[in-house]
Swiss-Prot record:
InterPro entries: DNA_mismatch_repair_MutS, DNA_mismatch_repair_MutS-lik_N, DNA_mismatch_repair_MutS/MSH, DNA_mismatch_repair_MutS_C, DNA_mismatch_repair_MutS_clamp, DNA_mismatch_repair_MutS_core, DNA_mismatch_repair_MutS_N, DNA_mismatch_repair_MutS_sf. It comes from the Bacteria. NCBIfam families: mutS1, PRK05399.1. Keywords: ATP-binding, DNA damage, DNA repair, DNA-binding, Nucleotide-binding. Coiled coil: none annotated. GO terms for biological process: mismatch repair. One of its GO terms (cellular component) is cytosol. Belongs to the DNA mismatch repair MutS family. It comes from Pseudomonas paraeruginosa (strain DSM 24068 / PA7) (Pseudomonas aeruginosa (strain PA7)). Residues 795-816 are annotated as: Disordered. ATP binds at residues 613-620. This is DNA mismatch repair protein MutS. Residues 796-816 have a biased composition (Polar residues).
């Protein structure tokens, strides 16, 4: 630590506080500004684009300094948090008027990306999560906390691959890991990783602190007593939350045990490819959520996002949601609920801020309005006969006493902060009313007092006045001073007058001179009392908020079902996936022409479709719409299809699109093969697999061989598979794999122009129309013409491929050496496979010229 003796007392105070928070930017309150010093100032000036100055000296050197007005700090804090920075807020807690030396200061709060709760610093439509992990490469404990809602969950996960997929789903703003873990682990590639002391993860301490937080003897009631790794991680999260918030956390009331087996698992690549709530460009436009989310409240939109990213495999839960949506669709009942739900607002985060004791006056006003809306909402729910909706109505309840309390306490349109008062309603507290009246009506009181005293004493020259030194007084001319009543106490003698004070005026003075500051202090005390009273009701209010969010999502899904023409899917026990007139919910919304719906049939006999057809013909759309229909069914939603019958799936895999990973040193082909390997290792006979153009990132024979082998492996696994390819050779797979069938997307050519019909038809495609697509894309005509010449020659010289045989369980000899073998010249390879008796003299001559050019 710096030698403090060379510094000014104020800077000594700063260094002591900064030493306790070396990793955070310190906002150091000085009057109306938050100041930053030294390296903090330099960093903040760069990040916030504010002026860096050097004012004064301490320790013989100029002090680098940057400052921001405290009343506009929110905008700067929001920017810093978005950039991943943490900020320690250091406030003046002493009174400058009475302080000897520097005003006493202390850090009252630490704002970090994962623990921020201020409305202005959060994205209202996304969860803001804090996570911690503990374990080794075989088994990990994962704990996740949303401090803005109170949701706190744990789970144990096997292996890095599954853990990283779960972290990608959760996308925590901060991730805590033990400091004794080796450097360079896969988890450290994520943003917001913080290393914490190993003892923060101590399981015994964690168990004790968690039981203390929840008021329980043990954790058996939460179903996680034996999850020792996850409990250690949860204890670290709880300690970190308390350290940053500097207050009790009454809104953290329970621990939920999440199980991956209860969900449909999507890996990171599948989540990205399906564009559930984030598109491939990182935005929200044209995502599944952008189409299916018309929720009335932000908390419901966040719940919808959680549902989309964590589909369920619990048939009872899914069918209860379906039944609820059907009930809300009857007689358009959702239309009665949605306007009332809009009045509820973001109750979930409001209650969390109340629990953290940093709720703003407008939070309480919104809570007041929400509670006032509940009785009408309850009345509207009485006719909803679906059991799940009835359970939600019971949980929601009403809170007439709290509604009345807030209606009496908070003015209609309160200011943003309590700092300057003006929040508590007149009539709520007699003492506050009196103090405010004194402050606001001092002039009128003095005029009334003067009139009364003139009448009482009969002295017409009597005056009531005030000066800053002597305070309030009654002044009489010297000649009338002797006639002053006995209760007049002499205060000051002037040349031509005497000044007096009376007990009544003295009492008024005591009140009036401090009325404004006392009124503000009283108002703040009443506000704190109000928060404490609300905290006493936090548990049922939070349960109500959760139920309201779910009701909002279900009403939204009913509205979407009506307006997007969605229908109820049916879950069955036997293995199948039948879709009639299925549509892509997102593409359908952006098309200016009607979307071409298509069928799909997979069952015990047919487990894989090999899909061929032209580029832009709709293969990827067809595959993605299938995955989205299955996913929507697994959140309990209705689906974009005339009819859908399906069995539960355990995973959805997608290998679609191409991109490299330059930062990770992986080529496009390596990324493609990594994703393919993940699918081949983890797909089961209950999985849905989408494979698009596997093998296109390498040479033709390598790519074809890999695609062929991958398709055969998936056929043996019996996963539901849609395998789109331009390798026409793969259309012979059904001959060796009975569970495989061919379908194609049709197109036609008219006047040398391609027309995509987008219909899925049985059998393989007759041609790929690649040159027509290239022409449509604007490739120059001479290039197209030359390509036709090459195509004609290649079609003449190429030979049909036979299905490689497999005997005695051994793989057939490859037609081409593997990537790392010494390759023969392609011409020699082709020559070795030609039977001269099978080709015409003209074909032989063409081949000879072609080989001559290539050699």
């Amino acid at each position: 630590m710096t030698d403090l003796s060379q510094h000014t007392p104020m800077m000594q105070q700063y260094f002591k506080l900064k030493h306790q928070h070396p990793d955070q930017l310190m906002f150091y309150r000085m009057g109306d500004f938050y100041e930053l010093f030294y390296e903090d100032a330099k960093k903040a000036a760069k990040l916030l684009d504010i002026t860096l100055t050097a004012r004064g000296q301490s320790g013989g050197k100029a002090i680098p300094m940057a400052g921001i007005p405290f009343h506009s700090a929110e905008g700067y804090l929001a920017k810093l948090v978005k950039l991943g920075e943490s900020v320690a807020i250091c406030e003046q807690i002493g009174d400058p008027a009475t302080s000897k030396g520097p005003v006493e200061r202390q850090v009252v709060r630490i704002i970090t990306p994962g623990t921020v709760s201020d409305e202005a610093l959060l994205d209202e439509r996304r969860d803001n999560l804090l996570a911690a992990i503990l374990g080794d490469e075989r088994l990990f404990g994962l704990a996740v906390l949303d401090i803005t809602s109170g949701r706190f969950s744990v789970q144990e996960i096997k292996g890095w691959e599954t853990l990283l997929a779960e972290l990608e789903r959760l996308n925590p703003a901060e991730l805590l890991i033990p400091d004794d873990w080796p450097q360079g682990l896969p988890a450290e590639k994520r943003r917001g990783v913080r290393r914490r002391a190993p003892w923060d993860f101590d399981r015994d301490s964690a168990h004790k602190s968690l039981c203390q937080q929840f008021g329980t003897q043990d954790l058996k009631g939460f179903g996680c007593q034996n999850l020792t790794l996850a409990i250690g991680a949860a204890g670290c999260l709880l300690a970190y939350a308390k350290e940053t918030q500097r207050t009790a956390l009454p809104h953290l009331r329970s621990l939920r045990h999440d199980r991956l087996d209860d969900t449909v698992i999507l890996d990171g690549a599948s989540r990205r490819n399906l564009e559930l709530d984030i598109n491939l460009s990182g935005g929200r436009e044209n995502t599944l959520q952008s189409v299916v989310d018309r929720c009335q409240t932000a908390m419901a939109s966040r719940l919808m996002s959680r549902w989309l990213n964590r589909p369920l495999r619990d048939r009872a839960v899914l069918e209860a949601r379906q039944e609820s949506i059907a009930c809300l669709l009857e007689r358009y009942r959702f239309e009665n609920l949605q306007p009332q739900l809009k009045e509820i607002g973001d109750l979930e985060r409001i209650l969390a801020r109340i629990g953290l004791r940093n709720a703003r006056p407008r939070d309480l006003a919104r809570l007041r309005d929400a509670l006032a809306a509940l009785p009408d909402l309850q009345n509207a729910m009485t006719e909803l006969e679906a059991p799940h909706l009835q359970a939600l109505a019971t949980t929601i309840g009403t809170y007439p006493e709290l509604a009345e309390l807030l209606a009496k306490a908070i003015i209609d349109n309160p200011p943003a902060v309590i700092r300057d008062g003006g929040v508590i309603k007149t009539g709520y507290d007699a003492e506050l009313d009196e103090l405010q009246a004194l402050s606001e009506n001092a002039g009128q009181f003095l005029m009334d007092l003067e009139a009364r005293e003139k009448a009482r004493t009969g002295l017409p020259n009597l005056k009531v006045g005030y000066n800053r030194i002597h305070g309030y007084f009654i002044e009489l001319p010297r000649v009338q001073a002797e006639q002053a009543p006995a209760d007049y106490i002499r205060r000051q003698t002037l040349k031509g007058a005497e000044r007096f004070i009376t007990p009544e005026l003295k009492a008024f003075e005591d009140k009036a001179l401090s009325a404004q500051s006392r009124a503000l202090a009283r108002e703040k005390a009443l506000y704190e009392e109000l928060l404490e009273r609300l905290i006493g009701h936090l548990a049922p209010l939070q349960d109500s908020a959760s139920a309201l969010a779910e009701l909002d999502v279900l009403a939204n899904l009913a509205e979407r079902a009506l307006n997007l023409d969605l229908n109820r899917p049916r879950f069955v026990e036997h293995t199948c996936l039948h879709i009639e007139q299925g549509r892509h919910p997102v593409v359908e919304q952006v098309l200016e022409t009607p979307f071409v719906a298509n069928d799909l049939a997979l069952d015990a006999d047919t487990r894989m479709l090999v899909i061929t057809g032209p580029n832009m013909g709709g293969k990827s759309t067809y595959m993605r719409q299938t995955a989205l229909i299955v996913l929507l069914a697994h959140i309990g939603s209705f689906v974009p299809a005339a009819r859908c019958e399906l069995s539960l799936v355990d995973r959805i895999f997608t290998r679609i699109g191409s991109s490299d990973d330059l930062a990770g040193g992986r080529s496009t082909f390596m990324v493609e093969m990594s994703e393919t390997a993940n699918i081949l290792h983890n797909a089961t006979d209950k999985s849905l697999v989408l494979m698009d153009e596997v093998g296109r990132g390498t040479s033709t024979f390598d790519g074809l061989s890999l695609a062929w082998a991958a398709a055969e492996d998936l056929a043996r696994t019996r996963a539901f598979t849609l395998f789109a390819t331009h390798y026409f050779e793969l259309t012979v797979l059904p001959e060796s794999q009975p569970a495989v069938a061919n379908v194609h997307l049709n197109a036609t050519e008219h006047n040398e122009r391609i027309v995509f019909l987008h219909h899925v038809l049985p059998g393989p495609a007759s041609q790929s129309y690649g040159l027509a697509v290239a022409q449509l894309a604007g490739v120059p005509s001479p290039v197209i013409q030359r390509a036709r010449e090459h195509l004609k020659r290649l079609e003449t010289t190429s030979l049909p491929h036979e299905v490689p045989s497999q005997q005695s369980g051994k793989p057939a000899s490859p037609m081409q050496s593997d990537l790392f073998a010494s390759l023969p010249h392609p011409v020699i390879d082709e020559l070795s496979r030609i039977n001269p008796d099978d080709i015409s003299p003209r074909q032989a001559l063409d081949l000879l010229y072609a080989w001559k050019m290539r050699v």
